[in-house]
Each structure stands twice: as C-alpha cells, then as structure tokens.
C-alpha cells in the first residue's frame, strides 16, 4: 500500500502540528486510546512508534496486538491538503525491545524523540498496516 510523501510528512510532523496520532488498543480491562507523538511511517507497509511511557497501551499489547491508529488534522482539511481531515489505519503491532528492528525504528525517529527523557529505554513498535482509509472509507490519498 503506497503511502504518499504528503502523508508521510503529515504523520511525521503530527505532534509538532498539534495533531498527534492516536493509538487504540484493547485489553482485559477494556479499550485505551493514547497519543503517540513519535508515530512515523516506517515504510509503505508499516507505521512505527517509540514506546516510552510503558503504561496501558503497552499492557494491552501484551494481550492483543491488534491496533487502530487515527490521524486527525482539521487545518490540513481546511487548507485542502487532506480532503476528509482524518485517516484510519488498522493493523497488528510487533514489539521490538532489542535488535536491529528496534535500532532501525529509533534511527527514523525525529531528533526530539531520540533525545526525549527515557528514549534509551524505549521499545520500538512496528505496526503492519492491514487496511487504511480516510474517515469516509476512501483509499489513502
């Protein structure tokens, strides 16, 4: 599933633009939604983020690796950059506590994420995208 340079740039700058990606997980105690400021497009088949907080989202991933990621940016919609203003990604996460994939994810993060307190103890999370669409169900632009 090709992800355009435009979408890559929007997602990479989501936190700085005030439109962070939200990660939805579910576990034995119910669902959880967490902002993930480190979310990036890893490649055309994956999103990735750096798990530093190690709280409810990580606990839920220990029970169920299925996730949803939503990106909402009303300014991009108003400016005509992103028609619906919303993107949804559904997929399966894989946790990388060590090894080459952890290091590869870390290398792709923005500098503010690489130097953030606790970054050295973070976990790389790679999300295989199984389907993605805008909020109206249209394919990614």
Q: Where are the language model's segments positioned?
A:
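Binding-site signature for planar aromatic cofactors or substrates
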Residues: 1-141
């Amino acid at each position: 599933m090709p992800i355009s340079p435009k979408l890559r740039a929007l997602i990479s700058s989501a936190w700085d633009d005030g439109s962070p990606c939200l990660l939805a997980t579910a576990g034995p105690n119910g669902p959880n939604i967490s902002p993930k400021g480190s979310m990036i497009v890893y490649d055309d088949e994956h999103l990735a983020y750096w798990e530093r907080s190690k709280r409810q989202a990580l606990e839920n991933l220990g029970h169920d690796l299925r996730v949803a990621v939503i990106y909402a940016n009303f300014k991009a919609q108003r400016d005509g950059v992103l028609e619906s203003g919303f993107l949804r990604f559904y997929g399966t996460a894989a946790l990388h506590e060590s090894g080459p994939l952890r290091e590869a994810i870390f290398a792709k993060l923005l500098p503010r994420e690489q130097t953030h307190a606790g970054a050295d103890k973070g976990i790389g999370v790679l999300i295989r995208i199984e389907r993605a669409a805008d909020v109206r169900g249209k394919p990614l632009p």
